[in-house]
Each structure stands twice: as C-alpha cells, then as structure tokens.
UniProtKB/Swiss-Prot annotation:
GO terms for biological process: translation. Part of the 50S ribosomal subunit. Binds to the 23S rRNA. This is Large ribosomal subunit protein uL15.
Amino acid sequence: MKLHELRPAEGSKKAPKRVGRGNGSGLGKTAGKGHKGQNARSGGGVRPGFEGGQMPLYRRLPKRGFTNIFAKEYVEVNVSRLNIFEDGTEVTPEVLKANGVISKVKDGVKILGNGTLEKKLTIKATKFTKGAVEKIESIGGKAEVI
C-alpha cells in the first residue's frame, strides 16, 4: 500500500444531502420539511431546551451556589514531577515555567504530595500540602512558602 492508494473506510463517507434540487432526487419541492408549520418556515423550529410548553427541566431545578470572584486558583504540581531537577536546585515558579512543568503561574503554585521525590531540592511555592512537606524534608530538602 502506498500513500496515493489510501482510501476512506467503506461506508465512512456519505454524499451530502442536496435538498430542493428537483423531484427526481427524492428531496425536491418541500426539501424534506413537509407542508407548512413552524418547521417549514425559514428560521423555524423551537429553541434548545423547549419542551412543548411544559415547564422545562432547566427551570424546574433550583438555582444553587455562586462563583466566588475572590477565589485563588493555584497551579498544582506533584512532588514526583520535580525529579527532573538536579540535586540542590532551587525550584521556584519561574523555574517550573521555564522547564515546562507548568504553563501558567496563575495565583501561585501549590505543591502536592503524590509520588516520590528522589532529589534534595529547595522548593519555593505559594502553598504546600502536609504530605508534600514531609516528603521534601525527609530527604533533606527545604519547603519555603513565598
């Protein structure tokens, strides 16, 4: 098989439905829309969520909660991801971004305790979990809140 011999799988491609192009096509005259009525008109049809006049589900369910506009969004990094650094490295949010561990700093970096840490590092972050601090300090590293 060569690249110019590649074909789509049998039955995976359908010819487009050409409506309103003569009665011989089977989709002429009313173009599959029937006679008159809301759905036959241009722009016809009901809005999404309309249930025929019955009180729709999105209005039957109660509103709940709110979005706290002061909520802080931290980028979470597990200690296992920090093994890419050399022993004795000072790891800061800027260093994490430069090495592709995180893409954005947002409101800060939170270090989580999932996985194992094999390198002795000085880690500076906005927040740490208890488990993360234990793992960092158990091998002689430092966890500093910035």
